[in-house]
Swiss-Prot record:
Cellular localisation: Cytoplasm
Lineage: Bacteria, Pseudomonadati, Pseudomonadota, Alphaproteobacteria, Rhodobacterales
Required cofactor(s): Mg(2+)
Keyword terms of this UniProt record: ATP-binding, Coenzyme A biosynthesis, Cytoplasm, Magnesium, Nucleotide-binding, Nucleotidyltransferase, Transferase
GO molecular function list: ATP binding; pantetheine-phosphate adenylyltransferase activity
Task of the protein: Reversibly transfers an adenylyl group from ATP to 4'-phosphopantetheine, yielding dephospho-CoA (dPCoA) and pyrophosphate.
Catalytic activity entry: (R)-4'-phosphopantetheine + ATP + H(+) = 3'-dephospho-CoA + diphosphate
Assembly behavior: Homohexamer.
Name of the protein described by the UniProt record: Phosphopantetheine adenylyltransferase
Length: 164
């Protein structure tokens, strides 16, 4: 069984993330969505909320197109998480050249720690390239409409968070 790991903070999960998830499902038998706890970031949503949102969106994807998705929160090194879930491939989405520079460094470090785990890059769909969780949160914070960037469930969570 080919297991892939798609890691991220998913704060919140966007339509861009969902596009990568759907396409990654075509490449592996099981896709693990690693919801990261990153001490260098201050997430808007608690880990439990992010996991719940990711799980809900992934359940919709599986119901619509099949496949197997597991949502797995993690706090350790990405390469250790990949080993923990039995992944042989790490899936990363790229939106722009700036993403590639960072990802290129990460691949080098991960390969130095375990060269048996491959990294695969999926280019963001042209319609989704501009979507970034950080920008979505800013638009929502300022009262803008984020429905072109996130699902209705995530939109409602953002509206609820900023209505406080």
């Amino acid at each position: 069984m080919r297991i892939g790991l798609y890691p991220g903070t998913f704060d919140p999960i966007t339509l861009g993330h969902q596009d990568i998830i759907q396409r990654a499902l075509e490449l592996v038998d099981r896709l693990v969505i690693g919801v990261a706890i990153n001490r260098d970031k201050s997430p808007l949503f608690a880990l439990e909320d992010r996991v719940a949102m990711v799980r809900e969106e992934c359940d919709r994807i599986v119901a619509k197109r099949g496949g197997e998705i597991v949502v797995h929160p993690f706090e350790n090194l990405l390469i250790d998480c990949a080993r923990d879930v039995g992944a042989t491939v790490i899936v990363r989405g790229l939106r722009a050249v700036a993403d590639f520079e960072y990802e290129f460094q990460m691949v080098g470090m991960n390969r130095a720690m375990d060269d048996s785990i491959e990294t695969v890059f999926l280019m963001a769909d042209a319609r989704r390239q501009a979507i970034a969780s950080k920008l979505v949160k800013e638009i929502a914070r300022l009262g803008g409409d984020v429905s072109k960037f996130v699902s209705p469930t995530v939109r409602d969570a953002l509206v609820g968070r900023f209505a406080r």
